[in-house]
């Protein structure tokens, strides 16, 4: 069995979808399934390379606009190589991959769509893209969604529910190493404090303003540490100053991957305050679960975030945009930490990378009748 993943980018470029593509490709390869990736690279020329056994066709980008790439070599390369593969596993949203597949000799191929999220922000461009997307949805043999919630509420998928297969994202514990010296340093820096950790790009849909405001309702021995950079940083700093929360909320900026695990390990609870379905899954919750850290997140309509965080098992799910509810949930978890002693077990059974790979291989075998 030979599988070609159509991805937007690929490692060493680091992103959420790219990591999922890598984990599935490498995991399937370890089970004897030949896996390759077609992706846009960040170089001025196209080239091929092997990474951890996965063959990557890296294609030059001619133009980048509204989070999408135009790459003539991507379209040409797919036409050249598609005959070598049994299954085309296309990761969306990615208009370029969709277009390339349309112009390829796809007729005798099995096609799996991996629906990572709807297109939420670029609404005008989406209208132009819709006919091509609908063609692909009709042509696909199966559609993977990362949660039952996303499949249920996505307007784009409503007419194709019979094709949906639910395969949650999984992460690999081997990618997360704790430095005990860093953990000790964090505890010393915030000595006597209950640590609430949060992480993500500082953008509107992440809802960090509500987490900052929640600090007004927290005791003085609580501190919120927010990792990440983004366009909302100045707004958050002004909010912290306005409410005089300098001793309760710290914006840490970018945290290196080598240090991230240590921040999770040092925290008492993790908070994902996202408010829009642009946050389709919330992989960062899995990272907290891995370290047996319970999570407070929001029940976002049409998003899988609240489904991933099982209420009263792995954490507490609250309504979005309510700072007081966030604060109340954070206090409840910290005051009854023993209730969430099995968070890591919940992770291992549901969100370990091996679970994702096994379910994906099962689907591959189903659609080619092995």
Regions found by a protein language model. Give the residues of each.
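Conserved acidic donor-binding segment of nucleotide-sugar-dependent glycosyltransferases
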Residues: 310-323, 330-337
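Short hydrophobic beta-strand element within catalytic cores of glycosyltransferases
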Residues: 290, 294-299
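Nucleotide-activated donor-binding/catalytic signature segment of Leloir-type glycosyltransferases, i.e.
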Residues: 235-255
């Amino acid at each position: 069995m030979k599988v070609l993943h159509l991805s937007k980018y690929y490692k060493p470029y680091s992103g959420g979808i790219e990591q999922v593509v890598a984990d599935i490709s490498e995991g399937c390869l370890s089970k004897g399934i030949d896996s390759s990736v077609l992706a846009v690279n960040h170089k001025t020329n196209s080239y091929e390379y092997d990474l951890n056994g996965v063959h990557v066709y890296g294609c030059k980008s001619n133009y980048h606009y509204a989070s999408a790439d135009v790459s003539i070599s991507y379209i040409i390369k797919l036409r050249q190589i598609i005959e070598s593969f049994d299954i085309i596993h296309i990761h969306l949203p990615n208009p370029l991959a969709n277009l390339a597949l349309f112009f390829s000799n796809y007729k005798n191929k099995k096609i799996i769509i991996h629906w990572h999220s709807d297109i939420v922000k670029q609404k005008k461009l989406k209208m132009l893209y819709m006919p091509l997307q609908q063609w692909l949805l009709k042509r696909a043999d199966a559609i993977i969604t990362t949660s039952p919630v996303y499949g249920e509420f996505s307007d784009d998928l409503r007419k194709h529910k019979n094709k949906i297969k639910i395969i949650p994202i999984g992460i690999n514990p081997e990618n997360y190493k704790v430095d005990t010296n860093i953990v000790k340093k964090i505890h010393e820096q915030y000595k006597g404090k209950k640590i609430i950790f949060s992480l993500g790009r500082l953008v509107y849909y992440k809802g960090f303003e509500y987490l900052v405001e929640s600090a007004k309702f927290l005791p003085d021995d609580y501190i919120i540490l927010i990792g990440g950079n983004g366009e909302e940083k100045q707004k958050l700093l002004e909010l912290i100053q306005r409410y005089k929360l300098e001793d309760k909320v710290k914006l840490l900026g970018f945290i290196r991957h080598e240090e991230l695990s240590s921040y999770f390990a040092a925290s008492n609870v993790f908070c994902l305050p996202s408010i829009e379905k642009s946050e389709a899954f919330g992989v960062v919750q899995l990272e907290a679960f891995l370290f047996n850290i319970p999570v407070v997140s929001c029940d976002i309509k049409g998003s899988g975030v609240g489904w991933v965080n099982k209420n009263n098992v792995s954490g507490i799910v609250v309504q979005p945009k309510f700072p007081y509810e966030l604060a109340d949930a954070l206090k409840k978890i910290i005051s009854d930490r023993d209730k969430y002693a099995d968070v890591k077990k919940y992770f291992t059974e549901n969100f370990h990378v091996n679970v994702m790979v096994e379910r994906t291989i099962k689907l591959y075998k189903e659609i080619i009748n092995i």
